[in-house]
Swiss-Prot record:
Pfam family, one: DUF576
GO CC terms of this entry: plasma membrane
Protein known as: Uncharacterized lipoprotein SAR0443
Leader sequence residues: 1-22
Lipid group attachment sites (N-palmitoyl cysteine): C23
Keywords: Cell membrane, Lipoprotein, Membrane, Palmitate, Signal
UniProt source species: Staphylococcus aureus (strain MRSA252)
Subcellular location: Cell membrane
Length: 266
């Protein structure tokens, strides 16, 4: 009888030990949540700025602060840089792109930049580059340089950045992306297939000459820390290109950095 009691007691102790060890392991698991996939991390990094889209009034950026780091001097409120361009293959076998960059200084609450027209040739010829200074007041683009071409002048004065009409709050709807990483830079890229039914795609087709029914690819690129850095940058590209020798895309970026003395040096 005494032997049987010892056996029962031994079994109880063993069961309790297994139960306690199991609880400890489950506790460790709960304390160490599973790290997000690189695709999810790239999306989260972009969400910090894309959640602000559409920015219908660009002057709202004066009251919004981005991620700060040690590159910012004391008292510097920082500067937003917003950029959009449309690039396409040209008849000369090169590339033409046209767009605008605007620097919004939160310290002075002023916005200056330029509209650019660039033509790159396949070979044996230097590219053509033209810049036209602009500023923004009351959410309106004001052309500062003289432009002879009335069509170009109209395009500049009526220009809208992709971030002013895009809505990319539901990045989670883009799944199974093709992710590539270069740890040496570091840089991160993710590609997602888009649908022609996407409202962002419809907006681009209504604003630009896109002579293809091919559904585009959304490309997300990050240089620098995934959590954000004033040294690195992020950009989006909506690529309508038909093949390797065909370029047709819209590039967009919105980055927060320390304010510069002269934005035109960019």
């Amino acid at each position: 009888m005494r032997y049987l009691n010892r056996v029962v007691l031994y079994i109880i102790v063993m069961v309790l030990s297994v139960f306690i060890i199991g609880c400890d392991k489950s506790s460790d698991t709960s304390e160490k949540p599973k790290e997000d996939s690189k695709e999810a991390q790239i999306k989260k990094s972009f969400e910090k700025t894309l959640d602000m889209y559409p920015i219908k009034n660009l002057e709202d950026l004066y009251d919004k602060e981005g991620s700060r780091d040690g590159e910012f001097k004391k008292g510097d409120k920082g500067m937003w840089t917003i950029y959009t361009d449309f690039a396409k293959s040209n008849k000369q076998g090169g590339l033409s792109n046209e767009g605008m960059v605007l620097y919004l200084d939160r310290n002075t609450r002023t916005a200056k930049g330029h509209y650019f027209v660039k033509t790159f040739y396949e070979k044996d010829k230097f590219p053509d580059r033209k810049k036209y200074k602009v500023e923004m007041k009351n959410n309106k683009i004001i052309l500062l340089d003289k432009v002879e071409d009335p069509k170009l002048k109209k395009r500049i004065e009526n220009f809208k950045f992709f971030g002013q009409y895009a809505n990319l709050k539901e990045l989670k709807n883009y799944n199974n992306g093709d992710v590539s990483i270069n740890e040496n830079v570091p840089s991160y890229d993710a590609k997602f297939k888009m649908s022609n039914k996407d409202e962002n795609v419809k907006q681009l087709r209504s604003r630009y000459n896109i002579p293809t029914d091919k559904a585009p690819v959304l490309k997300m690129h990050i240089d620098g820390n995934l959590k954000g850095s004033s040294v690195g940058y992020k950009k989006l590209e909506i690529d309508f290109s038909k093949g390797e020798k065909s370029d047709l895309s819209v590039i967009d970026s919105l980055n927060f950095q320390p304010a510069k003395v002269n934005e035109d040096d960019e």
